[in-house]
């Protein structure tokens, strides 16, 4: 299992726009944009997928964290940008199944063109981007220290600490560890400059 780190997009970056189809039928929206997704206190964008062991390892915590963040005024979306021709387990029909199985209460969007992932400079699954109420990037980094095969408990402590700071209107700080996971599965010939 290859380990790919986050690119660590520059803090303060404005949330890149998106308007993508939603495959979590439990949330009701057919399409979701940045404006739709943002809460009064901010927005959490998570690049995930169905098959990556790094995502599977923390999926239950993602469900809990998504619920908790929304309760504190942070909008939450997950985006799958993987090439589904090479990785059919990540196809939209399976996204719907995964969202229901995990109890995701947030939209699960499909970035078929992979342009949104490139705009965020997303590199791995999971990859997290937390924006403040002005939709400026406050945190990009890991959920916590847990990894498949490690004994670290899955607590979401790093991302939860950042969410608490954003909700309180406080600075998150710049000491942020990159997320780590499977690389996004780019379509052949579509790999971004920052990949590899």
List the predicted regions and their residue ranges.
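Chalcogenol-based redox active-site neighborhoods
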Residues: 1-176, 183, 190-196
């Amino acid at each position: 299992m290859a380990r790919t780190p986050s690119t660590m997009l520059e803090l303060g970056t404005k949330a890149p726009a998106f308007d993508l189809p939603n495959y979590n039928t439990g949330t009701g929206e057919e399409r979701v944009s940045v404006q739709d997704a943002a809460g009064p206190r901010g927005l959490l964008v998570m690049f995930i997928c169905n098959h990556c062991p790094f995502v599977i390892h923390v999926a239950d915590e993602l469900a809990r964290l998504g619920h908790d963040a929304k309760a504190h005024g942070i909008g939450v979306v997950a985006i799958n940008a993987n090439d589904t021709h090479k990785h059919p387990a990540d196809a939209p029909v399976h996204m719907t199944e995964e969202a229901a199985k995990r109890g995701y209460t947030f939209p699960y969007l499909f970035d078929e063109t992979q342009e949104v992932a490139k705009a965020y400079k997303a590199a791995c699954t999971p990859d997290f981007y937390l924006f403040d109420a002005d939709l400026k990037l406050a945190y990009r980094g890991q959920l916590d220290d847990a990894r498949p095969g490690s004994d670290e408990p899955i607590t979401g402590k790093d991302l939860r600490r950042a969410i608490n700071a954003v909700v309180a209107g406080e600075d998150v700080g710049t000491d942020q560890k990159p997320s780590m996971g499977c690389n996004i599965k780019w379509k052949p010939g579509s790999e971004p400059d920052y990949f590899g």
